[in-house]
Amino acid sequence: MWNLRITPLSFGAACQGIFTSTLLLSCVTVPLVCTIVYDSCLYMDINASRALANVYDLPDDFFPKIDDLVRDAKDALEPYWKSDSIKKHVLIATHFVDLIEDFWQTTQGMHEIAESLRAVIPPTTTPVPPGYLIQHEEAEEIPLGDLFKHQEERIVSFQPDYPITARIHAHLKAYAKINEESLDRARRLLWWHYNCLLWGEAQVTNYISRLRTWLSTPEKYRGRDAPTIEAITRPIQVAQGGRKTTTGTRKPRGLEPRRRKVKTTVVYGRRRSKSRERRAPTPQRAGSPLPRSSSSHHRSPSPRK
């Protein structure tokens, strides 16, 4: 077992030195990247901006786990990395891949150390209630140098003689949770950008709109399965491919002779087609010339002869 002979003063100084770099990154860098740098570097149209804002309202279980998310993002970005692309989605997604990967490893390390300390915590020790641990919203309002002091004061107020190992465990759990909540925004932004590279910004915008509509519809009035982006984009891809592979056996519509419509009229109570030849009318008045017969079409001999 460990022989920890540390006074509260040295414990505080040591912990401040250990966690300063981690807290500096987790509490300052992540919010700045997700707000100042992101909002100033990225320009999108109004529809894409609204869809991106709606991403923050989607449930947590909609997004993949951190490990799967980073792996999928790297697969989507690899062709653009090889071609040295400078598209906005490539640049921002690359930044978030590095950010999430580094901070996720740090957070996982905190959890592993905390779990290893659990073995040396006295069995009768009561865990620190969540209300005594600093939350993410509170950490944004506390100066970075005072974060450890505020957390230590809360632990002392819970139990003045709280064991040293249990204090370290409580600090690690609090800071790891702050890191995870800080990375949640970056995780959603990374999902948005690498999917825009895979499917197109317009398709992702349409998909988010349909998904939110499905989520807001009561269960008995909506479909059983949520819409997927593959189902939205597949018909368009198939239609485009079909146009290229058609053999063209059918004549274009514009080159086909238009069939003349046969109009009919009613004459004296019977239907007659205008396209049919009309018969020569019989003389009805006195003095009208008699119609020539078909045999008299040739010219009569001149009377001079």
Curated annotation (Swiss-Prot):
Compositionally skewed regions (Basic residues) per UniProt: 258-277, 295-305
Functional summary from the UniProt entry: May regulate immune response to the intracellular capsid in acting as a T-cell tolerogen, by having an immunoregulatory effect which prevents destruction of infected cells by cytotoxic T-cells.
Organism (species): Duck hepatitis B virus (strain United States/DHBV-16) (DHBV)
Signal peptide (UniProt feature, chain positions): 1-19
Database matches in Pfam families: Hepatitis_core
Signal in keyword set: yes
Keyword Lipid metabolism: no
Similarity comment text for this entry: Belongs to the avihepadnavirus precore antigen family.
Classification lineage: Viruses, Riboviria, Pararnavirae, Artverviricota, Revtraviricetes
Compartment(s) where it occurs, according to its Swiss-Prot or TrEMBL record: Secreted
Disulphide linkage map: none
Name of the protein in its database record: External core antigen
Molecular functions (GO terms): structural molecule activity
Main location, first listed in the record: secreted
SUPFAM superfamilies documented for this protein: Hepatitis B viral capsid (hbcag)
Region spans: Disordered: 226-305
Cleavage (site feature) positions: 272-273
